[in-house]
Amino acid sequence: MVDTDKFDILLTQEEHLYAIFRRDVFWTDREHDTITWEDIKKCPLSLSGGSVRMIMQSSLTDMEQLNAVAITTTKSSAIEWASSGRTVSLVPMDAKELINHRKMARIKLPEFSGDFKKAFITLKGHALSPVAQQFIDFYKAYV
């Protein structure tokens, strides 16, 4: 458990779970507006650490029901698996994040919407460097 008394929260941003996949490999027989959780469970998956936490905190599924081919430490690694056409990637993202890979689709999984947030934090009493403050200011303007 994290000792929250030691940290200042600078910014929080809501995140949702998204399925990322190659349109020319998965679900080629239909439009890509929605995907069901049952569809996802039938596919080989690449999961980021964040998506594993989101899935484990939900009551929708047991991790053993999923065909997880790769569990990665970063979103970008999970997305790379999907861009190769080998897996459907499940990653937490905010609404404004984009996928800049050709032939890729990104669909929000509404079953996993809600109480998931990412946070920018610092140790209490520690000032940000000018570069870090510039990044936070840029990010706040972006969201």
Model feature map: region roles:
Residues 106-143:
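A late-sequence structural motif
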Residues 15, 42-43, 84-85, 102, ...:
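Structured helix-beta-strand junction loops
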Residues 10, 18-20, 26, 88, ...:
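Residues embedded in well-ordered beta-strands
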Residues 1-17, 21, 105-107:
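Short beta-strand-centered segments that line the small-molecule binding cleft or hinge
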Residues 50-107:
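Hydrophobic hinge/microswitch elements
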Residues 27-29, 33-37, 41-64, 128-132, ...:
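Secondary-structure junction motif
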